[in-house]
Amino acid sequence: MAKLETLKAALEKVLGKRVQKLIEATGELTLIVKADDYLEVARTLRDDPSLRFEQLIDLCGVDYSDFGDGAWDGLRFAAVSHLLSVTHNWRLRLRVFAPDDDFPVVPSLIDVWNSVNWFEREAFDFYGIVFEGHPDLRRLLTDYGFVGHPFRKDFPVSGYVEMRYDPEQKRVIYQPVTIEPREITPRVIREENYGGTQH
């Protein structure tokens, strides 16, 4: 725990007012910054000798629209980076919220850590978060003509289109989803001696 306290003090000293929030939970530290400060903070985290986060291990998108059983009233989309300082043996989670829920845009970190390239593409593909300044921001895992962003909470579980092989056309075709939603009621069997106990 002393290591986390040392890191927390170093972050507060070096970043000052650019720290929007610093959360310590379950033995981990999360730094939240504003989108306007995101790129500058990332460079500082990498270059400052007292921090030296040389590696970005992962970046993912998050949709907070139903977070906390729908009680969330903050911004909807966030990009969350996981950083590693080999020099100091520290780990840090860096979170930035996109200021616009309708068109989420945050700066790209590709000029700071080039390992973020495909991680940002994945977050764009699945959540629709645009990383401004990314040299090749295109879909990574979904199909070329895919409509929407499948990890958003408002995306239908069954999707919008399905593909199947058409024997008449002898090729794979796309068509609107034909899955009919149905209600499944579980069958409950009651036993007199449930669990082997006598009443």
Swiss-Prot record:
Alphabetized GO MF terms: NADH dehydrogenase (ubiquinone) activity; NADH:ubiquinone reductase (non-electrogenic) activity; quinone binding
EC number: 7.1.1.-
Native source organism of the sequence: Cupriavidus pinatubonensis (strain JMP 134 / LMG 1197)
Name of the protein: NADH-quinone oxidoreductase subunit C
Gene3D superfamilies in UniProt: NADH:ubiquinone oxidoreductase, 30kDa subunit
Quaternary structure annotation from Swiss-Prot or TrEMBL: NDH-1 is composed of 14 different subunits. Subunits NuoB, C, D, E, F, and G constitute the peripheral sector of the complex.
Gene name, Swiss-Prot/TrEMBL: nuoC
Catalytic activity as recorded in UniProt: a quinone + NADH + 5 H(+)(in) = a quinol + NAD(+) + 4 H(+)(out)
NCBIfam families named among the record's database cross-references: NuoC_fam, PRK06074.1-1
Topology versus the membrane: Peripheral membrane protein
Subcellular location: Cell inner membrane
Keywords of this entry: Cell inner membrane, Cell membrane, Membrane, NAD, Quinone, Translocase, Transport, Ubiquinone
Top-level lineage group: Bacteria
